[in-house]
A protein has these predicted regions:
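Short amphipathic alpha-helices and their capping/turn segments at secondary-structure boundaries
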Residues: 58-61, 100-116
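Gly/Thr-rich phosphate-binding beta-strand-loop-beta motif of the actin/hexokinase/Hsp70
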Residues: 46-81
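Short, small-residue-rich loop/turn micro-motifs
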Residues: 75, 123-125
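Short hydrophobic beta-strand segments
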Residues: 1-2, 61
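Generic structural signal for short, solvent-exposed loop/turn connectors between secondary structure elements
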Residues: 76, 114-115, 130-131
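Glycine-rich phosphate-binding loop and adjoining helix at the ATP-binding site
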Residues: 3-34, 84-103, 118, 125-149
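Charged, flexible boundary elements
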Residues: 25-50
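Short beta-strand segments
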Residues: 63, 120-122
Length: 149
């Protein structure tokens, strides 16, 4: 319906009522977000993939939170190391702080295993092809620095 289209087009734009969402999606897709009216709906491309359940080998689990970070080392399903460290990513503008905190956690966990077969990461945000498109943890890192990494 063209009335709904015009409404959505008006609110999801720069200076529109939903400018935050427009800007967010523009960052995710790396181009200005736009509302498009079409008569043709593309065919769905769903391809379900079973994930998880792998307990064999040497694995690291990492959770990047807003006030702490957690990391665990697991060998053949048994936890061999686990730590929780207070950190402040949401209020820190220096990208080295983030990088060093994450690398330190991963290296510490890895030091408790003979090798690393897999790393699983949990963090709020949108990640595409191992690239951080948007993440609340890096709110204070300027875009000029953020997109260098």
């Amino acid at each position: 319906d063209s009335e709904i289209y015009e409404y959505l087009k008006d609110v999801y734009r720069a200076e529109g009522a939903r400018e935050f969402d427009w800007d967010f999606m523009s960052d995710v897709f790396e181009k200005p977000f736009e509302v498009v009216l079409t008569d043709e709906i593309p065919e769905t491309l769903d391809k379900p993939v079973s994930m998880g359940g792998h307990l064999d080998g040497c694995r690291i689990g990492f959770d990047a939170g807003g006030s702490d970070r957690k990391v665990s080392a697991v060998v053949d399903g048994e936890t061999v190391y686990s730590e929780e460290v207070v950190w402040f990513p949401k209020i820190t503008a220096d990208p080295d702080y983030h990088y060093e905190g994450i690398v330190s956690a991963l290296k510490t966990a890895a030091s408790h295993m003979p090798r690393v077969d897999a790393i699983g990461v949990s963090s709020a945000g949108v990640y595409v092809d191992n690239r951080i498109m948007v993440a609340s943890l890096f709110l204070k890192v300027s875009n000029d620095l953020f997109f260098l990494f």
